[in-house]
């Protein structure tokens, strides 16, 4: 694959990042940063709105992002897709914590939209351990339609080092 060839040349391909990605692939420090719209079910319009909103200031947390974007062009499904694609990984919160707290966050967002005059404190998120590497790779496949960070075969290679001999070592 193209990604494997890039790795052979010591070029890292990074998943989309909520504060770095644009509408096109970018090269930075020998790394390729993927655009937001490679995420399944994230349109060019949604990606463009995220980038425009980010011009007012970087997103400082998932809740900061959700407050600024939810209900405009980003709904629960889009939030799930963005989380599963790992775009918030650089905001110091893991994907499982976000997914497991998402309904509570959305309730908070909808309540704060309805009650403008009252100050509503942000929800306190319950921490969860990050998904296993194999689960993250599955989520990556469902988010992009391809494996970006690793391929499941790599887990088997690492965990099941099998001694193999070349056919040249066998005599007839």
Model-derived segments and spans:
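Ligand-binding pocket segment of bilobal, Venus flytrap-like solute-binding proteins
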Residues: 1
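Sliding clamp-binding short linear motifs
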Residues: 4-171
């Amino acid at each position: 694959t193209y990604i494997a060839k890039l790795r052979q040349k010591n070029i890292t391909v990074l998943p989309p990042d909520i504060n770095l990605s644009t509408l096109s692939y970018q090269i930075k420090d020998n790394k390729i940063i993927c655009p937001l719209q490679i995420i399944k079910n994230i349109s060019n319009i949604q990606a463009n709105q995220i980038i425009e909103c980010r011009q007012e200031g970087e997103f400082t947390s998932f809740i900061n992002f959700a407050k600024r974007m939810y209900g405009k062009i980003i709904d629960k499904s889009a939030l799930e897709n963005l989380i599963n694609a790992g775009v918030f990984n650089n905001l110091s919160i893991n994907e499982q914590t976000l997914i497991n707290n998402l309904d509570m966050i959305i309730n908070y967002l909808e309540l704060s939209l309805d009650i403008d005059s009252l100050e509503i404190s942000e929800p306190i998120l319950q921490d969860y351990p990050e998904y296993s590497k194999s689960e993250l790779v599955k989520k990556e496949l469902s988010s992009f339609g391809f494996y970006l960070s690793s391929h499941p075969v790599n887990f088997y290679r690492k965990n099941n080092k099998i001694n193999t001999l070349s056919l040249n070592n066998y005599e007839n």
